[in-house]
C-alpha cells in the first residue's frame, strides 16, 4: 500500500509538471510550488498531532498484556461456537483497534498471539492466517483510525464526523466476519476443531478473566472515543 501511495503521488506530480510545462523553465515549474504549498498546509494541521498519541495509547495497551488475557478469555467464553478461537481473534482485533488505530499493530500482535494458538489447536493454517489478516484490517474503519485522521487532514473534513460515520460500519464488518467464520467452521469442522473440555477452567474463572481483561479497555474506549464522539474533546486533545 505504501508503494502504491508513492506511485500515485509520482503520477500526480508528473501530470502536473506536464500541464504547467513551459519551455526554458525546466526547474521553475508551478507544480513544485503547488507540491510544497499543499504539503506544508497538510502537515501544519493540528489534527495530525493525535497520530503519535494514539500510537502511544496502543503501545501502552499492548505492553500491559491486556490483549493477551482478553483473547484467551474470549476464546473460553465462546468455546461452544464453531471456530471459537477464530471468533475470539476477530473480537479481540475489533476491540484492540479501538485502542490502537493502526493496522500494522493489530496484525503484528494478533499474528504473534492468536496464530500460534490456533495452529496449536489444529486449526488450518490458511484459515487462521485469513482470520488474522481480516481482523487486522478493521483498524482502518474503527475509530480512532489513523487513516481517518490523515484523510480528514488532506480532505479538510471533520475527524469527528468521519469517526461517527465509520464506527458502525467497522463493528458491523467485524460482526459479518464472525458470522462467516462460525458458518464456515460449522459446515467444515475439520479446519477449526473444538477445544478439549478437560482443559477448560470453571465458569467463574472464565467470567472473572473476561471482566478483568475487558474492563480496563472498556474504560479507555469510553473515555477516549466517548469524549470525541460527544464533542467534549478533539482527537488531538
Regions found by a protein language model. Name each.
Residues 1-237:
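Alpha-helical transmembrane segments of multi-pass membrane transport proteins
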Amino acid at each position: 500500500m505504501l508503494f502504491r501511495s508513492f506511485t500515485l503521488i509520482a503520477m500526480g506530480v508528473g501530470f502536473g509538471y506536464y500541464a504547467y510545462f513551459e519551455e526554458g523553465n525546466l526547474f521553475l515549474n508551478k507544480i513544485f510550488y503547488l507540491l510544497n504549498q499543499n504539503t506544508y498546509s497538510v502537515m501544519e494541521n493540528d489534527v495530525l498531532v493525535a497520530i503519535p498519541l494514539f500510537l502511544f495509547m496502543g503501545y501502552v495497551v499492548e505492553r500491559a498484556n491486556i490483549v493477551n488475557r482478553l483473547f484467551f478469555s474470549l476464546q473460553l467464553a465462546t468455546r461452544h461456537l464453531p471456530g471459537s478461537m477464530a471468533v475470539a481473534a476477530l473480537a479481540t482485533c475489533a476491540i484492540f483497534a479501538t485502542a490502537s488505530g493502526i493496522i500494522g499493530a493489530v496484525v503484528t500482535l494478533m499474528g504473534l498471539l492468536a496464530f500460534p494458538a490456533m495452529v496449536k489447536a489444529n486449526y488450518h493454517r490458511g484459515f487462521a492466517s485469513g482470520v488474522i489478516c481480516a481482523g487486522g484490517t478493521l483498524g482502518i474503519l474503527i475509530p480512532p483510525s489513523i487513516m481517518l485522521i490523515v484523510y480528514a487532514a488532506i480532505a479538510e473534513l471533520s475527524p469527528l464526523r468521519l469517526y461517527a460515520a465509520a464506527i458502525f460500519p467497522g463493528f458491523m464488518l467485524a460482526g459479518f466476519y464472525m458470522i462467516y467464520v462460525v458458518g464456515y467452521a460449522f459446515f467444515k469442522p475439520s479446519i477449526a476443531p473444538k477445544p478439549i473440555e478437560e482443559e477448560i477452567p470453571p465458569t467463574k474463572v472464565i467470567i472473572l478473566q473476561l471482566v478483568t481483561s475487558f474492563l480496563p479497555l472498556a474504560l479507555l474506549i469510553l473515555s477516549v472515543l466517548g469524549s470525541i464522539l460527544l464533542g467534549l474533546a478533539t482527537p488531538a486533545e
